[in-house]
Regions:
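Beta/alpha (TIM)-barrel catalytic core signal, keyed to glycine-rich beta->alpha loops juxtaposed to Asp/Glu
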Residues: 57-251, 261-273
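Outer-envelope exported proteins of Gram-negative bacteria
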Residues: 1, 51-53, 90-92
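Active-site mouth loops of central-metabolism enzymes
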Residues: 18-34, 62-66
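Active-site groove signature of glycoside hydrolases
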Residues: 39-63
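Short, acidic/polar
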Residues: 29-43, 94-101
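A short, structured active-site edge motif that brings together acidic residues
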Residues: 1-8
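Cysteine/selenocysteine-centered motifs that mediate thiol-based redox chemistry or coordinate metal-sulfur cofactors
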Residues: 253-256
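Surface-exposed, active-site-proximal loop segments in enzymatic domains
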Residues: 9-27, 158-161
Length: 273
């Protein structure tokens, strides 16, 4: 599985200009898209790509008509699938509404929503997951640990004291949820990563989870956690109740907030930020 959106070779300079130039030709040029596909084949040493996706389809440089699921990139993916160069075509990104709109077109086989679910919230269940179920689209969740949000990886109650003074009600909901999540971790003896991985497994609509890891040991731990299967019904029910406590900051805002607050933890021992 791979994606297009970071173009290779002579397209690289053109991509660098897209911050200022939203109609960059690389994103609507099927010749350059084919170059990206062929390069991926070479890197993967495969004659056929199992899944080929559009990276961040909400980027304006793709010039996609979301309502009607039209655009040069979509046309290219459909043609590549017809020609047998790819088996399945998909989407990956952060904008769950845009992903939902495109999934509803029935043109796609696969979607990877980044940061769309954690122990705190699961916004992809508002619109995206129902659309995927309706249209038979496979889901690979990206970043269930909150995109390396430290208080979702390491149970350190000092984070609660750092978050409590913040007046945003969405942050206070995070505190309320973390208190119960940490208590559940204490009661079950399960680490936050294991709770997360097995909680996601409880959701049959999600085919796989791209958890991410910084060390080989993390990969081994994640595999071991997944091997234990879904959480027991009572533990799952408690996490579902925690989800209902209230709206939280979006996960990317929480991640960025944690990067600011971590400087106040002189002896923080969790994952690297």
């Amino acid at each position: 599985s791979t994606k297009m959106g970071y173009f290779e070779g002579t397209v690289r300079e053109e991509y660098a200009n897209t911050v200022r130039q939203t109609d960059a030709k690389a994103f609507v040029d099927p010749v350059k898209m084919m170059r990206a596909l062929k390069h991926s084949m070479w890197l993967l040493q495969k004659d056929v790509i199992d899944i080929f996706s559009i990276h961040e389809p909400d980027w304006p440089q793709w010039q996609i008509d979301y309502e009607h699921a039209r655009g040069a990139a979509i046309d290219f993916l459909l043609e590549a699938k017809r020609e047998g160069l790819v088996r399945s075509i998909g989407l990956g990104g952060w904008d769950y509404h845009v992903l939902s709109q495109l999934v509803k077109s029935g043109k796609f086989d696969f979607v990877l929503p980044a940061g769309g679910m954690s122990l705190l919230s699961k916004p992809i269940y508002d619109e995206l997951i129902p659309a995927c179920v309706q249209h038979g689209v496979g889901v690979a969740l990206g970043g269930g640990f909150g995109q390396n949000t430290p208080f979702l990886i390491t149970k350190d109650r000092r984070w609660l004291e750092l978050l409590r003074p913040l007046e945003d009600e969405r942050v206070q909901n995070v505190v309320r949820k973390l208190e119960r999540i940490y208590r559940l971790s204490d009661e079950t003896g399960l680490s936050l990563p294991e709770l997360t991985i097995r909680y996601i497994i409880n959701h049959e609509e999600i085919a796989t989870h791209v958890a991410g890891a910084r060390e080989i040991a993390h990969i081994r731990q994640n595999v071991e956690s997944a091997g234990r299967g879904p959480l027991a019904p009572d533990v799952f029910r408690e996490l579902e109740e925690i989800q209902k406590i209230g709206e939280c900051l979006p996960i990317w805002d929480l991640r960025d907030l944690s990067r600011k607050l971590v400087k106040k933890l002189a002896h923080y021992t969790g994952g690297k930020i």
